[in-house]
């Protein structure tokens, strides 16, 4: 039986349908780790500009560079499966705590302006979604934003990716399977070329391309904070022989020095319920993740538990 990917209409949060929509979001967080938002409040005109300028920037500044990389690595003539490279062309924009847009020389002023406007809208949407999760979890409004804050506010950035046509998609992934390390991810994906797959009950399920939607997925930090009630989920991008797929993924993550641990309200007061996840500084987790991104998340959590035990012997981690 084909599973329907969860699609949430945010217009229905206003009025009598609110409880039903919150239940849909809760079910998606518990059973999928992903859901797709429509009527999310970001203007279609702005999204169309972002898409147009992103595709123009790829053609002008990134396409030739990607072809040269493919040629230098011989990726267009591989005969066996490649497991250490992704078929993607990317660059990264940092928005918070400090923007790096002025440092990226090949972005024209119009593109910078539009991406700044888009990032501002996504930041607001991320915080709105986090508060919906708080409401479902029985946490006070603003709890997740506060935990993410650290001393300088959250980390927020955007990975802009293009997945060009691939001559041998059966031998190389657009992006290998992984869970995301951070907090809340907001994806504006191509509405014509598919390729994003989510692992659901042991099967890969396609995330349907929808015009003007934003796909939400949960990172490892939300799994920790919810003590496993919500899950980060493995996902991948399949390379395609036809079509150039655009993907703009924005990551609303904890600040580097934010201390991450299961919310006490989700652990205390429940008989036989124990704290399943460790307490750690987000930056320490990221340092570990860099080398283990394309592996299962459980060994990362175990490594952080071991680090927590060592820290307990040396003294407690301060909670901001």
Swiss-Prot record:
GO terms for biological process: ethylene biosynthetic process; fruit ripening. The keyword 4Fe-4S does not apply. Its EC number is 1.14.17.4. It is an enzyme of class 1 (oxidoreductase). It holds the Pfam family 2OG-FeII_Oxy. One of its GO terms (molecular function) is 1-aminocyclopropane-1-carboxylate oxidase activity. Fe cation binds at residues 178, 180, 235. It comes from the Eukaryota. It catalyses: 1-aminocyclopropane-1-carboxylate + L-ascorbate + O2 = ethene + L-dehydroascorbate + hydrogen cyanide + CO2 + 2 H2O. Belongs to the iron/ascorbate-dependent oxidoreductase family. This is 1-aminocyclopropane-1-carboxylate oxidase 3. It comes from Cucumis melo (Muskmelon).
